[in-house]
Amino acid sequence: MSKELKLFRNFGIMAHIDAGKTTTSERILYHTGKNHKIGETHDGAATMDWMAQEKERGITITSAATYAKWKGHSLNLIDTPGHVDFTVEVERSLRVLDGAVAVLDGQNGVEPQTETVWRQATKYNVPRIVFVNKMDKTGADFYYSIETMKNRLGVKATAIQIPIGAEADFVGSIDLIEMKAYIYDGQADEEYKIEDIPADYVTKAQVMRSQMIDDVAIFDDEVMEKYLSGEELSHEDIKKCIRKGVISTELYPVLCGTAFKNKGVKKLLDAVVDFLPSPIDVPPIKGVDDHGNPIEYHNDPSEPFAALAFKVATDPFVGRLTYIRVYSGKLDKGTYVYNATKDKKERISRLVKMHSNNRDEIDSISAGDICAVIGLKDTTTGDTICDEKKPVILEQMVFAEPVISLSVEPKTKADQEKMSLALSKLAEEDPTFRTYTNEETGQTIIAGMGELHLDVLVDRMRREFNVQVNVGAPQVSYRETFTEIADAEGKYIKQSGGRGQYGHVWIKFEPNHDKGFEFVDNIVGGKVPKEYIKEVENGLIEALTSGPIAGYQTIDVKATIFDGSYHDVDSSGMAYKIAASLAFKEAAKVCKPVLLEPIMSVDVTTPDDYFGTVMGDISKRRGVIEGQEQRGNAQAIKAKVPLSEMFGYATDLRSNTQGRGQYIMQFSHYAQAPKSVTEEVMAARAKK
């Protein structure tokens, strides 16, 4: 079986928006025989972009999974979004992939969102190869793209191909391993002629090959010895070194082409097979057993079954689809599995291999593979399903908290019930989407990662669930925290004949910067019985959801229970829960609470002519400029700006730059809001 696993490649395609990821994926599907005709994103016909909104907007929102074959290898390919509002899709894909292809725009090289997805891939130790796309575009520069990798990503980027021609004259590439020229006919089947290197490229190719060998030989001792003794390295020697370097995540080979013009994708597929790891080349996945002991799984089909659910989607024909990556053992359809995260037993009705949103039924799946499961009702993103006799919880995924919210109201009574169902289904699919009811106003609030994120979700409610809603203006999700240390008492006593209520606690509250809520039990001598400690913690967690300044969630607080008392008859869990919330209210009077506002990382690209105007506008929005650099004939500005100042920025940037400026924005951190903002928020709160 390990022989078979050696032939698997689980890889994703990642990039900045508009670098050509989906077009590259479409060409891969065409060349591997999965598609008989090529879909283009600008026509709204791309196979991988199957949601209605994706076809309209020409961007990828969800990570579509598909499988294909290439030169005897089985490929599981995941196309991920490049838009920053949908990074959860990138995050959960990278968690289960063994390798990735980073697609760069040949003119722009590394762009802001490239840096974001690159960081995410580094976090999960995902080996990568790089495809410099759009080499036919005006201003395309392969060598500049490599420089941006070195300067902006700080990595060892090594060309294993170089382009022949550029812009409209781009005709093919020189393979530096074989030292041959590949000249493409530009037709859909990507036929090419292998020729000798053109005379005017020989010197450049020799220099670049020598550089490549210098970079890669260090990854294999035998090859290094050969190289140092002046022996000629074979193609296999070089490939072996590149593969080792890629798998170690210390080397990033760079290829070039233009997917849209059918040049270079077949060679990219060869590189996927040659250099990206198989499931047995990657480190084992870690987890904990039911006793909390660490455990490892080695992608071995003979070990007990364990898999990670990395995505939930609703299919109009079969209902709930759960995408899983199998790390150990084998799974057959019609069998039962144990969800160790939720402590529930579930039945696998059917197993399907997904080709975008089409389904091919399979009977079983083994370690190293990816598929979708029909029949799991309680399993959500990040859950581990496994063999009941050998429970395990695999490393879980941590997702960012939503930073923007808005209210939604059903237009009619009939829409009310449908809306609740739609929201619960959408929340199941997307861990960065939250929905709750505002206790004071009774409004239904939805929260997410950005305006586009919420816009798409509201659109899906209308289309997929036929729910008509009125949408409120976007609101910032502020937070609150304490800045001083204080001891606070919470006492809840109710005694009026019959059994009463008695709960009494002393809790120390202190700031816990960037560490979230932390609860510590320092009770000695049973002053508060053990069985009530959990209720004290629950009472605090509940109290934290509504802060003292403006009712926003209180974060980054450490609470230590150190004293209290109890009553033999009247004490109860509920009484201690209430006592804890009273202690929180007391602490809020003396711990000097402050309002925190979300600060966003903003990357703006503007033509030189509008640079001053754009900089002035950022400063006006309380932005702090962190850096700027020249990119071609444009300026790239990095800044930190409060989210509350960024509403309507897209429109202003368009008018300030005659429609030529671009920006991306993502959450960075929470920071204390100025007094004027706090007063404004409190005043708005008082009006409600």
Curated annotation (Swiss-Prot):
This protein's name: Elongation factor G
Location(s) in or outside the cell: Cytoplasm
GO CC annotations, alphabetized: cytoplasm
Keyword presence, Transcription regulation: no
Protein residues bound to GTP: 15-22, 79-83, 133-136
Annotated family: Belongs to the TRAFAC class translation factor GTPase superfamily. Classic translation factor GTPase family. EF-G/EF-2 subfamily.
SUPFAM superfamilies: EF-G C-terminal domain-like (SSF54980), P-loop containing nucleoside triphosphate hydrolases (SSF52540), Ribosomal protein S5 domain 2-like (SSF54211), Translation proteins (SSF50447)
Organism: Ureaplasma urealyticum serovar 10 (strain ATCC 33699 / Western)
CDD domains: EF-G, EFG_III, EFG_mtEFG1_IV, EFG_mtEFG_C, EFG_mtEFG_II
Matching SMART domains: EFG_C (SM00838), EFG_IV (SM00889)
Stored PROSITE patterns: G_TR_1, G_TR_2
Keywords: Cytoplasm, Elongation factor, GTP-binding, Nucleotide-binding, Protein biosynthesis
Boundaries of every tr-type G domain copy: 6-280
Alphabetical GO biological process terms: ribosome disassembly
Gene this chain is encoded by: fusA
Highest taxon in the source lineage: Bacteria
Coiled coil (residue ranges): none
Molecular functions per Gene Ontology: GTP binding; GTPase activity; translation elongation factor activity
Purpose of the protein: Catalyzes the GTP-dependent ribosomal translocation step during translation elongation. During this step, the ribosome changes from the pre-translocational (PRE) to the post-translocational (POST) state as the newly formed A-site-bound peptidyl-tRNA and P-site-bound deacylated tRNA move to the P and E sites, respectively. Catalyzes the coordinated movement of the two tRNA molecules, the mRNA and conformational changes in the ribosome.
